[in-house]
């Protein structure tokens, strides 16, 4: 098969030939332009799936039509103790433009809780052993209204090293402990608000990893699990996923968890940086001009300034699906959408 024919086998796969344009490649805080050897295979992301026109409506529908359990409103009673856990700043990357999807989910959930007389509500960031989010980051993620009402007493980071704030809920068949955030574990209802960007996000991993302690984490976040995983992004071939599933089943047996999972598209850039999503062979004169302008500007800035400039560009992710209910049926549907 000729190179000219091979390069057209899929819209996201290109084989470099004599007529191919130079390729843009990230290099630290820079972008370089290089002519690649003939025959090099270049992979591009699929075009972004169109976002849902009304994400608020999609979230409300999911809450009222859950998988494997009663609707959220039917599980609420006045005076009950509810904890809402949310993904930390590691999802998504780069950070999304505001309002964050977590803010939208929280606004809808908190209004529903208030409407059913549920006043004992805490919001916990499921940061596991990641660094704790800063006050500014926490405010940006949930918006001023929620932040001002709940921070700092009822909106805070999970602390995996605070012994009094942890409780053991079980152990695996290998006697590996599962120790979780005490507030979450002792609540009448734990609601988890999740964002799925890649297949290793969400599902059983959300609670079992996001709200655990070091001893629980060390059983699967270690070199042997990495060696035993063909790919973190293929759950069926991931030892990490298998271990998280075993822990997650303990969570589901011991706690009442209501998952809200969302899938987002891959629309990382728009406007002056949208050319970075394109095949260089399809660049217009304006695209090339934007790249040269960006490269020239970057070359004149010190490294810290380049880094700050790149990180100041929020991603333009859009929600493409939302499902709610029990862990596995919800995650199966979200993963299927993410793989599209």
Segments the model singles out, each with a brief description of its role:
Residues 40-66, 88-95, 320-340:
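Acidic/glycine-enriched edge-of-secondary-structure segments
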Residues 93-117:
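Histidine-anchored nucleotide/phosphate-binding helix
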Residues 62-77, 177-186:
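Short amphipathic alpha-helices and their capping/turn segments at secondary-structure boundaries
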Residues 117-129, 260:
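Short internal beta-strands
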Residues 1-59:
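N-terminal amphipathic/basic leader segments beginning at the initiator methionine
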Residues 81, 85-90, 194, 262-263:
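Short loop/turn segments at strand-loop or loop-helix junctions that form parts
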Residues 148-339:
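Conserved, well-structured core segments that form the ligand-binding/active-site neighborhood
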Residues 67-88, 115-118, 340:
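Glycine-rich phosphate/diphosphate-binding loops that line cofactor/substrate pockets in enzymes
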